[in-house]
Amino acid sequence: MKQLGIDAVIDLHGVLRTNFLKFLWGRNFYQIDKGRNEKEKLIKGKYFKQLKTTHQRYLDVFKNINYNLNFSKTVFPKKTNLSGYAITNKIDFNKKLIGIAPFAKHKAKTYSLEKMKEVMESISKEHTILLFGGEENEGKQLKIISEGNENIFSLAEGFTLSDQLDFISNLDLMISMDSANGHLAAMYGVKVLTIWGVTHPYAGFAPFNQNSKYSILVDKNRYPKIPTSIYGNKSPEEYKQAINSITPEEIIKKIKEII
């Protein structure tokens, strides 16, 4: 790196290997403050308040090297033209286009698929639904759901990530867990309804530029230890189904409020 004549290093990751790089580099190394101590206090229940968002933490790194950046004039990518996709011949674009990404990496962050199917059945009466997923097993489950409803389409099989992003850019609303699809939709300026289980937006990981009202949370009085972890990978056994205390009716009501 020194041979390349680099003036400074910006580290937006803040992990062990970049800390090692910081030690070797020794100068003009600007690193993200991930707020680990604050987050630790949050999950231990020492306090319960909104922490700085991850987006703001990224921005702060650039401000430290005198880049005058802010979120006041946010520009999002334009919607992608979907005419090249054969599936669009079956989609009624006169209806609102709602994306649903019903899966997450950890089970304690994943809403019951049976309950989500109730949501789908209700809102598909008036709107078009696109289903997003990744793994092979997810794709099979979503295909079965879509085959039983003419207003529900699965993009989990036969569509690359790039393809899925094209469709995400055209959504009127994305419904997701605390997972990647919600963040991807937010990057296109799409409204995102996030369903939270054992994690919480106070940790700073809510999708970018979203109204706080676009979150459905588990009852904190019933599950006072939430957030049990930052990423949803740790939770008491009795909390693993906490997300399913949210009713389909709550989700349907919130969808109607947003769109």
Please name every model-derived segment.
Residues 1-259:
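Catalytic machinery of carbohydrate-active enzymes
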